[in-house]
C-alpha cells in the first residue's frame, strides 16, 4: 500500500484503533520530547501537553471529524467534564507548538528503524532508502498564505496555500525515517539537504534531485552513504572507463554557478552510468557505487526498478495528495504541527 493510500485510510480509524496505536508509543518518549523542547506542562490544565500531543495525532487519524469530536473520542480532557471548548483546544495547540511533535517523530523513527533493520534484507551490505517530496494544501487564511505561499508564489492568486515536505523512506517497511518541512519558496533540494541519512546505505532519488553539490554532500552525510537515480536525458559527460556493455565510469562538469555557491566543489565529478533496455525503452541510471565487482549493473538496475518505480507511492503523492488531503490548521505554526502529527500517524499505521 502506498503512502497516499495509507494516509487516506486515516479517515476511517476508530477510537479503539487509536488506543491500539497508543501502545506503540512509550509515554516516556512523549515526556522526553516535551521536556527537551521546554513544553512540559507545569500547571494543571484540562488539556495537559501530553494529551495535546495525542490530540494532534488524533487529528491525523480522524481527518474528516471536527476537533471536539477527536477530543471526546480519545477522552483527552482531564477533570469531571469531557467537554473542551474548541477555542481552548486551539490555545492548547498554540502553547504546544510544533517542536515536540517534530522531536517525537524523530525519536520514534530512529527507535523503530533500529529494530526494523535487524529483520530486513539489505542490498549487498547497504540499507535501502528513498527520498521525494510531498505538497499539502491548507485553508486560505492571510497568515497561511503570507507564510507558505503556493506553487504560484505569494503574489499570484491561488486557491490554497501549500506546504512542502521532503521525506526519507525505508523502502522495505515504508516507514518514514526523516522529514523536513518548509514553505513553497524552499525547493525540494533545499529541504533534502537537511535530511539525515543512516550510514552504510543507498538512497534512491528522482531525477529532480540531480545536482553535483547535493549528491556529493549526500555521500558525506554519513559513512558509506550512496545514491542511485535515473539519469537525465541531457546529461553531459565523458567516459573515463568502460566497465562492460552499457556500464561506464564517467566524468561530468560542475557548473560555474554551483562552484560559486559552493567553492569546495571542483570543476568535475565522477559517477557510474548504466544503460539498459526496460519494457522496450532505453533507460540510463547513475550512481555513486562505482565498484562494478561488488555492485553489478544488473542488480543495481533491478534495485531501482523494484524498490522505486513499482513499490513506492511517492509519485502518486506528488500528483494527487494536494487534492486528496487538506490540512485543517489556519495558522502556520499549527500547520507544521499538524504535518508532524500526520507523519507520526502514518508511521503508526505502518507498524500496526
Label for each model-derived stretch:
Residues 1-67, 93-96, 103-112, 123-127, ...:
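Single, function-defining residue in the core of a domain
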Residues 65-82:
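DNA-recognition alpha helix
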Residues 85, 130-131:
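Noncatalytic, basic helical substrate-engagement surface that gates or grips nucleic-acid strands
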Residues 115:
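Glycine/small-residue-rich loop that forms an oxyanion/phosphate-binding "nest" at active or ligand-binding sites
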Residues 81-98:
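Major-groove recognition helix of helix-turn-helix-like DNA-binding domains
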